[in-house]
């Protein structure tokens, strides 16, 4: 048995190596993986494995009751986390039942789907956070690492079970078997009910209830939305022939960042709700002085959205379901030079017109006392400021549930707040946001960064083997009104896209959407990053209903005669400081900036060499407008097609958005250089 398992593991490693080699030989954006390059071996299917191993007879019976054995008998790429019979004995005892006979067919279906994932994962590919593919019950499995009772380094799942060391990574014809020590369970409760059951966060939860914000956290799904109403859409972007579908569901989600009772007591001496209210007053009376003497400020009016405690709690919550700790920042740091800049994402909070900054620490130069690899909220550590921010904990105690049907919560090692420090220092920077982060629905509905970014899809693919592209029917996205097709293109690490993915408009499009809030009033540049292509078109941009400059022509690159022409220099690192300053100032005066110097793409599918965006004429940023912005008002961008030369196949790319205060963009007027990252 052991020898057979070792041979299977060898075959899996060989298959992985050969796949990697085949990827390395592919070039060009349109190349498809050649099936002849893949190593395949004959052996038992997953269904046969289960039937041939009596120690999994209970799970085998569960799968048969769920009528899923045929699936495991067919070709595919699955991971099966099969619980042992001993695990089921403990599960039955926990539920107060005797055997599988006491389970309903629906129970069996849920259990089977919870332990099956439609992708192959070796233990070496399971990083802390969650698996990047949901299980067949559409829930994400939490991953952590620890030692088993024999001091073997093993993978833990949902903090309660671990993969059995002596049986891990056992390959079968259609996937990998990863036997586990316990039956995996997922909560079917809403987020407030999950939080209520954890006594370690009782004070924050009491504040959630007292402010009435708890009632906002029960939304789950729009049952009036029906994906079948929307047909598949075929389109061509440059040379890539693709399809997009409407999202399967329209779900709502929430993510809370919660200081435990012990954190509040240890750091601030807070042990009751009134003390927490006083702390909130200390913070928010300074941020919102106009409300400090209002009736809304009183302790008797905690449900008023202007109340300090209400603001305090609201700022700790996002109106999106961030599926795991590793999803708080760009997944796998895709397309980011992590030695130069920390991967960062910004998300709006439930406190109106505010955002939180999430950062994975990777640049050692500015680590300070923080831990490299960890994720922090509202951190700014550079030559001018040393604000460490609040650390997000990877997990919670195994006796408590962290994820709910409509979201999850994370422990944090301090409070977070939209304080004067956050507003005036942390947020006083170039705020860069991948367009997929602006719309919460993309994260909540498992759309953002889905799929495998290293593979190219066949022309007009409908299998979604490597991931899916989506389009959003008008009304699906909050604060968005759209004619034409608004598409999310899944990540490809060899496309000219920041963080690998992009959003595109097709057809006779006309879209209006709310942009993220700025932290304070003043003059702001609104920039957009994109890739120029000859197949793209022309659009007029509006800010708050007013047209901004001449129409934007996406067929023009930086070396066009109207911009830099022959003065373009690709290798900006060879320039002197004076030359670089002049280059940046010249571009700025024409309304452009080079692409992100901290972003890159691979040179072809499966490539190993890379190209930095700032060195290319086709990947750059354009200034959409320079405007005075009120932080307490909603602001909107409108993009309307004005090109007819490409008919209804007219295309407009939205890669990333930048909100830049005058304190940043104005430095070039004084002969300085804005950092190019």
Q: Can you say where each PLM-predicted feature lies in the sequence?
A:
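Sec-dependent bacterial lipoprotein signal peptides
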Residues: 1-27
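Mature, structured domains of secreted/extracytosolic soluble proteins
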Residues: 12, 28-677
């Amino acid at each position: 048995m052991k020898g057979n398992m070792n041979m299977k593991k060898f075959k899996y490693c060989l298959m992985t190596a050969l796949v990697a080699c085949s990827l390395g030989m592919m070039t060009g954006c349109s190349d498809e993986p050649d099936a002849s390059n893949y190593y395949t071996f004959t052996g038992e299917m997953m269904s046969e494995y289960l039937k041939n191993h009596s120690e999994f007879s209970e799970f085998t019976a569960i799968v048969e009751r769920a009528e899923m054995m045929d699936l495991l008998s067919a070709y595919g790429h699955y991971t099966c986390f099969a619980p042992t019979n001993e695990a089921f004995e403990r599960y039955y005892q926990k539920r107060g039942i005797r055997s599988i006979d006491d389970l309903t067919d629906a129970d069996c279906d849920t259990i089977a789907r919870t332990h099956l994932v439609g992708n192959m994962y070796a233990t070496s590919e399971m990083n802390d956070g969650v698996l990047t593919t949901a299980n067949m019950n559409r829930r994400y499995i939490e991953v952590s690492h620890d030692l088993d009772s024999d001091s073997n380094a093993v993978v833990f799942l949902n903090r309660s079970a671990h993969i059995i060391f002596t049986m891990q990574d056992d390959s079968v014809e259609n996937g990998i078997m990863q036997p586990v020590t316990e039956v995996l369970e997922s909560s079917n409760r809403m987020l407030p009910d999950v939080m209520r059951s954890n006594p370690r966060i009782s004070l924050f939860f009491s504040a959630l209830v007292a402010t009435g914000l708890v009632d906002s956290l029960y939304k789950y799904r729009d049952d009036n939305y029906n994906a079948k109403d929307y047909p598949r859409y075929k389109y061509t972007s440059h040379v890539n022939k693709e399809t997009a579908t409407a999202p399967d569901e329209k779900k709502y989600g929430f993510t809370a960042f919660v200081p435990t009772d012990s954190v509040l007591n240890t750091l601030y001496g807070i042990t009751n709700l009134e003390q927490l209210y006083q702390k909130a007053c200390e913070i928010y009376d300074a941020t919102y002085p106009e409300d400090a003497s209002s009736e809304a400020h009183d302790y008797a009016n905690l449900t008023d959205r202007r109340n300090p405690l209400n603001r305090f709690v609201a700022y700790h919550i996002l109106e999106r379901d961030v599926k795991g700790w590793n999803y708080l920042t760009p997944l796998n740091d895709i397309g980011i030079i992590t030695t130069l800049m920390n991967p960062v994402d910004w998300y709006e909070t439930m406190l109106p017109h505010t955002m939180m900054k999430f950062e994975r620490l990777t640049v050692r130069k500015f680590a300070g006392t923080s831990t490299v690899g960890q994720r922090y909220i509202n951190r700014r550590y550079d030559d001018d400021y040393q604000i460490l921010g609040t650390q997000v904990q990877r997990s919670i105690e195994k006796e408590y549930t962290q994820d709910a049907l409509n979201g999850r919560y994370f422990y944090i090692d301090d409070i977070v707040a939209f304080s004067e420090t956050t507003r005036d220092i942390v947020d006083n920077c170039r705020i860069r946001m991948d367009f997929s982060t602006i719309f919460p629905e993309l994260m909540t509905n498992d759309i953002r960064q889905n799929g495998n970014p290293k593979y190219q899809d066949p022309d007009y693919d409908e299998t979604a083997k490597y991931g899916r592209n989506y389009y959003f029917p008008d009304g699906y996205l909050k604060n968005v009104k759209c004619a034409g097709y608004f598409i999310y293109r899944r990540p490809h690490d060899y496309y000219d896209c920041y963080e690998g993915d992009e959003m595109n408009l097709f057809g006779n499009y006309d879209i209006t959407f709310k942009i993220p809030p700025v932290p304070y009033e003043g003059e702001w540049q609104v920039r957009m990053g994109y890739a120029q292509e000859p197949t793209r078109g022309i659009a007029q941009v509006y800010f708050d209903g007013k047209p901004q400059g001449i129409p934007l022509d996406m067929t023009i690159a930086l070396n066009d005669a109207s911009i830099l022409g022959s003065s373009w220099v690709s290798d900006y690192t060879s320039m002197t400081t004076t030359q670089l300053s002049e280059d940046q100032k010249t571009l700025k005066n024409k309304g452009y900036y080079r692409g992100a110097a901290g972003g890159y793409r691979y040179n072809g599918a499966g490539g190993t060499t890379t190209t930095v965006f700032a060195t290319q004429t086709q990947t750059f940023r354009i200034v959409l407008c320079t405007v005075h912005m009120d932080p307490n008002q909603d602001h909107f961008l409108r993009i309307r097609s004005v090109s007819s030369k490409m008919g209804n196949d007219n295309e407009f790319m939205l890669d990333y958005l930048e909100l830049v205060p005058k304190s940043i963009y104005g430095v070039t007027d004084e002969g300085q250089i804005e950092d190019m990252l």
